[in-house]
């Protein structure tokens, strides 16, 4: 991996009219909050009251995809939401023939493949996957994700420990190749699927 760069977490709060459901503080869109501030004395009792008042179910229909046009992200749980401080949960959707950015970082990640067929390239080695598989990105691995189908999308649910690593000041991350700014050839029509399809049960 190339010499890593330090990424300093931003401390800016969402501005007026911005909501967690409609926008995410990732990539080049906005300042990012990876870890909420911890400062001064606090009451564990008050913190428990606050946590218990948080929603136990987040409506996926209210959380929109961003990025694209080949790789889209929908961030379900982030530290800035106030629900969790140690992990990051998001959905990735790859258009037909699409690919993600190529980068590397200190934290590991697990990709549960929900739909489609594709492959990873980790440190120059290809690993194929299909729906039902789990792809593991290990620490300090330069990686990129690819949809192997030219006609169908693919999607994966991703769990990361990135916020915990940021909290421990293990901030090293390096982008090697940015997300494509143009659709994959032949997939100019594709938009991320906002709805969830049930692939496991027959319709009544």
Which residues make up each language-model segment?
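Conserved short histidine dyad/triad with adjacent acidic residue
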Residues: 73-77, 89-104
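Short acidic-glycine-tyrosine-enriched beta hairpin
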Residues: 124-140
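Short histidine-centered beta-strand/loop micro-motifs
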Residues: 78-79, 99-105, 128, 146-148
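Glycine- and acidic-residue-biased ligand/ion/polar-headgroup-sensing regions
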Residues: 96, 107-118, 123
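A short, N-terminal "cap"/entry segment at the start of jelly-roll beta-barrel domains
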Residues: 2-85, 172-204
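Short beta-strand His + acidic residue motifs that chelate non-heme Fe in jelly-roll/DSBH
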Residues: 100-102, 120-121, 137, 143-150, ...
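A generic "binding-loop/recognition-motif" signal
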Residues: 106, 125, 141-142, 162
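A short hydrophobic beta-strand segment most commonly corresponding to one strand
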Residues: 86-89, 110-112, 136-137, 151-170
């Amino acid at each position: 991996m190339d010499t890593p760069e330090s990424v300093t977490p931003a401390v800016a709060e969402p501005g007026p009219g911005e909501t967690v459901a409609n926008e995410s503080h990732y990539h080049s869109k906005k300042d990012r909050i990876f870890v909420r501030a911890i400062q001064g004395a606090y009451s564990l009792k008050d913190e428990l009251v606050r946590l218990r008042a948080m929603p136990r179910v987040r409506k996926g229909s209210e959380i929109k995809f961003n990025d694209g046009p080949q790789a889209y992200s929908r961030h379900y749980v982030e530290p800035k939401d106030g629900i969790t401080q140690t992990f990051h949960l998001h959905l990735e959707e790859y258009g037909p023939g699409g690919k993600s950015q190529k980068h590397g970082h200190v934290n590991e990640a697990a990709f549960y493949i929900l739909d489609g067929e594709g492959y990873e390239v980790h440190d120059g080695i290809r690993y194929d996957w299909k729906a039902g598989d789990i792809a593991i990105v290990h620490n300090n691995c330069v990686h990129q994700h690819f949809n192997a189908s030219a006609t169908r999308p693919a999607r994966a649910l991703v769990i990361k420990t990135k916020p915990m690593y940021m909290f421990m000041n293990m901030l090293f991350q390096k982008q090697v190749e940015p997300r494509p700014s143009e659709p994959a050839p032949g997939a100019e029509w594709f938009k991320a699927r906002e709805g969830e399809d049930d692939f496991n049960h027959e319709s009544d």
